[in-house]
Amino acid sequence: MKIKSAGLLESAAGANQFPDLVMPEIAFAGRSNVGKSTLINSLLNRKKLVKTSSTPGKTRLINFFLINEIFCLVDLPGYGFAKVPAEMQESWRKLIETYLSRRDNLRGVVLIIDIRHGPTAQDRQLKSWLDFHQRPMLVVASKSDKLSRGKCASQLQKIKKDLELAQLPLPHSSLNLSLIHI
């Protein structure tokens, strides 16, 4: 698909700020600093549409990006080790759960996992939650350029087994802004 237009539609701190849309949405989820924003930029062939940072926890709102006026990509706050108070992390968790459970137009979730570390307990918990709520999911293994080809292939198999996936996760590299073919 050729991306003709892409822009920030809304940044929501609460469910009352979610845009009232009927178009399909794809959400991007994962721990803090795993590469959610980088993956979205890569898929859209944009370098700076979605703000990225080397500091975990920079995405603090649910950001809705309108693509070609026909669908939205949704950047969720990361979970895990962001250096913010526990109350704020809990409010993010509730906001994410509200979004994932209430959006009728949510067509799927891209779960992003750092290939070097594999799934965390929170990744497994989110995967179980998505399975239970019958939300379609695609797993992407980020930071694949940090490993050799052989180690990358081995890690993909481990992630597949650990998460009980039907197919291998898709490896992604931020260096060449693309999905890697193994």
What positions do the PLM features span?
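Conserved G1/Walker A P-loop phosphate-binding module
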Residues: 1-76, 81
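Canonical P-loop GTPase G-domain recognition
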Residues: 3-12, 147-180
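Residue-level recognition of specific faces of alpha-helices
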Residues: 25, 61-64, 95, 108-111, ...
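Adenylate-forming
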Residues: 39, 181-182
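Conserved nucleotide-binding/hydrolysis micro-motifs of P-loop NTPases
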Residues: 58, 71, 78-81, 116-118, ...
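Flexible beta-alpha connector loops of hexameric P-loop NTPases
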Residues: 80-89
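Amphipathic alpha-helical transducer elements in NTP-driven molecular machines
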Residues: 89-93, 120
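Conserved C-terminal guanine-recognition region of P-loop GTPase G domains, centered on the G4
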Residues: 98-166
